[in-house]
């Protein structure tokens, strides 16, 4: 008779701990790229819409991920993601 395999994978964090850690990482990255007032207003909007719920946490994570992805894709000056490589002249010769 077949049996289900034992769970041999790594121990996982509880969903809520992982979600809160992800939110903190996204917030710390977002403050490097967007004005704080924008982020504050986004937080206010999420709070007014969802209140203090997990749905609000998931919504702000989704929005911050989308904002950061688009920001990097367009070409953030802090990142090389989305920036096409340009050849530079050698020996210091440049055109201005």
UniProtKB/Swiss-Prot annotation:
Alphabetized InterPro entries for the sequence: RetroV_VpR/X
PTM section of the record: Phosphorylated on several residues by host. These phosphorylations regulate VPR activity for the nuclear import of the HIV-1 pre-integration complex.
Top-level taxon of origin: Viruses
Coiled coil: none
Misc note: HIV-1 lineages are divided in three main groups, M (for Major), O (for Outlier), and N (for New, or Non-M, Non-O). The vast majority of strains found worldwide belong to the group M. Group O seems to be endemic to and largely confined to Cameroon and neighboring countries in West Central Africa, where these viruses represent a small minority of HIV-1 strains. The group N is represented by a limited number of isolates from Cameroonian persons. The group M is further subdivided in 9 clades or subtypes (A to D, F to H, J and K).
Record function comment: During virus replication, may deplete host UNG protein, and incude G2-M cell cycle arrest. Acts by targeting specific host proteins for degradation by the 26S proteasome, through association with the cellular CUL4A-DDB1 E3 ligase complex by direct interaction with host VPRPB/DCAF-1. Cell cycle arrest reportedly occurs within hours of infection and is not blocked by antiviral agents, suggesting that it is initiated by the VPR carried into the virion. Additionally, VPR induces apoptosis in a cell cycle dependent manner suggesting that these two effects are mechanistically linked.
Subunit structure: Homooligomer, may form homodimer. Interacts with p6-gag region of the Pr55 Gag precursor protein through a (Leu-X-X)4 motif near the C-terminus of the P6gag protein. Interacts with host UNG. May interact with host RAD23A/HHR23A. Interacts with host VPRBP/DCAF1, leading to hijack the CUL4A-RBX1-DDB1-DCAF1/VPRBP complex, mediating ubiquitination of host proteins such as TERT and ZGPAT and arrest of the cell cycle in G2 phase.
Protein name in UniProt: Protein Vpr
Organism encoding this protein: Human immunodeficiency virus type 1 group M subtype B (isolate NY5)
Lineage, opening ranks: Viruses, Riboviria, Pararnavirae, Artverviricota, Revtraviricetes
